[in-house]
Amino acid sequence: IIIGHMLNFEGTHADVFEVFIQIGAILAIYTHYRRTFNGFLKRKNWIKTRGVSLLHISAGMLPVLMAGYLMQYIIKEYLFGPIPVIVGLIIGAIFMIYAEKRTVSGRLVDSVNNLTIYQCFQIGLYQMLCLWPGFSRSGATIAGGMLIGCTRRAAADFSFIMAVPVMIIVCVYDLEIGRAHV
């Protein structure tokens, strides 16, 4: 957003370009976690009590998708400028430092397979911070996971597994919106 503003590359075409950039990230994450994603294709893994399931992923995605949809006008109108993005970067960095210092001590969730559906939902609530452009989605979810009692590894694994469906949904939505404006 900041570079796009400096180069005067803004508007619908820039939005579509940003969507296509995300495809590389989606493919990289999918490649790394392909066993987990391929496991989701089995119906028995859609809803299960042990290990990460589609239900866990859905619980994590729900807050950000609903908030993003409901607040899309406000976000696009007021937060997609260089100054709000810089503020988001700074606040995001402070939040991640805070999470490092305030990580819950004691018994930590040490694997993505040990997350409860409620914990996934809580991480999803933290993910809403990334609706502020500049605030890192992975930073928000990893830091949020650490604040609710996950190890950095468990929070990162869940963050990246959850990223693929979220980014796919956002990309498809943005492409459809972009197509409507072309």
Residue ranges of each PLM-predicted region?
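Multi-pass membrane proteins that catalyze or facilitate reactions on polyprenyl-/lipid-phosphate substrates
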Residues: I1-R179
